[in-house]
Amino acid sequence: MARAKFERTKDHVNIGTIGHVDHGKTTLTAAITMTLAELGGAKARKYEDIDAAPEEKARGITINTAHVEYETDSRHYAHVDCPGHADYVKNMITGAAQMDGAILVVSAADGPMPQTREHILLAKQVGVPKLVVFLNKKDMVDDEELLELVELEVRELLSDYDFPGDDIPIVAGSALKAIEGEKEYKDAILELMKAVDDYIDTPEREVDKPFLMAVEDVFSITGRGTVATGRIERGKVKVGEEISIVGIKDTRKATVTGVEMFQKTLEEGMAGDNVGLLLRGIQKEDIERGMVLAKPGSITPHTEFEGEVYVLKKEEGGRHTPFFANYRPQFYVRTTDVTGTIKSYTADDGSAVEMVMPGDRIKMTVELINPIAIEQGMRFAIREGGRTIGAGVVSKILK
């Protein structure tokens, strides 16, 4: 049988399952593929196939993640599921699997548990825009009132973390019963997917966002000017446009007089392209690796931020010893290392933390020695002598 060509006619959305261990995330993932497979929208995947997730590396960290894909009438989905709690934490913080929305799985028999709370907090911190809830194991709850209580509890918990708890769609069902083929429960899976279709927004495409390119290298071409090279992270750039050069030194403007890719001249470069941009009115010494070229006004330089960070264990190549306030590692942002001082650490409940151990997840306040173009939701690595000792995401800009 010839392989079907991938038709990009439907909107593409990245989602994932999150929630407490053993509440049924992987079973639900399997149930979605099996239920949609009957409608021709997926390849059925068994629990065992999904659970045996391959290892992958993101920002120097090994993570186990399973990727499945399926489609509904209106959309094509890429869905991530992680076997272990630590994998979720690492995945969400590194952004290895970017999520446009997530399905929070809560066992109706147990209600919200510690990791339910932790995953909701993480979703908020790393910028997952919308959640839909699946109350699993409904077949194990005889009392309708109990089901309503769990639903209320979940809605309150979501509101605690600034998600719109009253508006979030909650669908009750049983992933296992759906896999076993019971109609009522297969219908609940379809109802869940309808909620995901309707409630989780289609993300803005990278190419439609404001232009940004991190500078990787700079050289001058005699008689023509200065060229900055790098990969366009988002948006597009045309010959003749004015751009800002942001970070390290004072922000300044320049005009793009040429866009080149693989020795060919282009009219415009777009997200994903590796290009050289010829800039007018800029000397080679005015621009360096670590700066970004961006649409004027779209990004600003900052020195102080809060980050949600996963600190590598020593088995993962991280530090062997704890660290404290005023620790000064390098923060690897986009294309460059910037030294910064970690001023303080905070636990999930807002209390101050004195000492951070390898393997911890922690919120930290960082002050960089140079202003860099950073924004909320941006990923970074923490390095010491060239090796990665942590991964983080900017949760809040302070100044």
Swiss-Prot record:
Catalytic activity: GTP + H2O = GDP + phosphate + H(+)
Biological process, per Gene Ontology: translational elongation
An annotated GO cellular component: cytoplasm
Single GO term (MF): translation elongation factor activity
Keyword tags: Cytoplasm, Elongation factor, GTP-binding, Hydrolase, Magnesium, Metal-binding, Nucleotide-binding, Protein biosynthesis
Domain tr-type G: 10-204
Stretches the record annotates as G1: 19-26
Chain spans, region G2: 60-64
Region (G4): 136-139
Localisation: Cytoplasm
Cross-referenced InterPro entries: EF-Tu_GTP-bd, EF-Tu_GTPase, EFTu-like_2, EFTU_2, G_TR_CS, P-loop_NTPase, Small_GTP-bd, T_Tr_GTP-bd_dom
Stretch list, region G3: 81-84
HAMAP family reported in the protein's UniProt record: EF_Tu_B (MF_00118_B)
Function: GTP hydrolase that promotes the GTP-dependent binding of aminoacyl-tRNA to the A-site of ribosomes during protein biosynthesis.
Subunit annotation: Monomer.
Family: Belongs to the TRAFAC class translation factor GTPase superfamily. Classic translation factor GTPase family. EF-Tu/EF-1A subfamily.
PANTHER family (alphabetical): ELONGATION FACTOR TU, MITOCHONDRIAL, ELONGATION FACTOR TU-RELATED
Protein name stated in the entry: Elongation factor Tu
